[in-house]
Design a protein with these regions (language model features):
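Glycine-rich FAD pyrophosphate-binding loop
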Residues: 13, 25-61
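Conserved N-terminal helical subregion
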Residues: 85-154
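Beta1/beta-strand and adjacent pyrophosphate-binding region of the FAD-binding site
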Residues: 2-18, 36
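Acidic-histidine catalytic/liganding microenvironments
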Residues: 30, 76, 135-136
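Short alpha-helical segment within the catalytic ATP-binding CA
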Residues: 21
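N-terminal FAD cofactor-binding segment of flavoenzymes
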Residues: 53-97
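Glycine-rich Rossmann-fold phosphate-binding loop(s) that bind the pyrophosphate
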Residues: 15-17, 40, 121
């Protein structure tokens, strides 16, 4: 565990897929910022050949990633690692069983390759956390909780 810094430009509380992705995007777009990512649970040691052991947010559940999210991961240089573990969404069926109305969307009819991708959270976690370790402007503090924050005027 890294000691919690006393000051940072940005503090991200929560190291799930959204928090880690935000940290990666900030490191890429605004590398001059000092970012602190705080996660209550300990992150496991990474072995890219193995799925993560249970970690909140990076477990055996699956997540549907929108086309824009897939594009963001490509911009971060991560999609090449993620793609072999992804399944494209070609069709969406929307209904409220027992009630009037439904909608069916087909990627082909919308002239898009897919609406997004479905991926197991565990592999997404492996790739995101490995990328995070390569970001010198992000300090990761795992296994800690935040009880208070103070904002400072510049």
């Amino acid at each position: 565990m890294t000691a919690l810094p006393t000051e940072a430009d940005v503090a991200i509380i929560g190291g799930g897929m959204v928090g880690v992705t935000l940290a990666l995007m900030l490191a890429r777009e605004l590398p001059q910022l000092q970012v602190v990512l705080v996660e209550g649970q300990r992150f496991p040691a990474l072995d890219l050949t193995q799925p993560l052991p249970y970690t909140a947010g990076f477990d055996a559940r699956n997540t549907a990633l929108s086309r824009r999210t897939v594009q963001a991961f490509a911009e971060l240089g991560l999609w090449q690692q993620l793609q072999p573990h992804a399944t494209p969404i070609h069709q969406i069926h929307i209904s409220d069983r027992g009630h009037f109305g439904l909608s069916r969307l087909r990627a082909e009819e919308e002239q898009v390759e897919s609406f997004g991708q479905v991926m197991e959270n565990a592999w997404l976690g492996v790739v995101l956390l490995a990328a995070l370790k390569q970001c010198p402007s992000v300090t990761v503090c795992d296994g800690v909780s935040v009880s208070a924050l103070q904002t400072l005027a510049e």
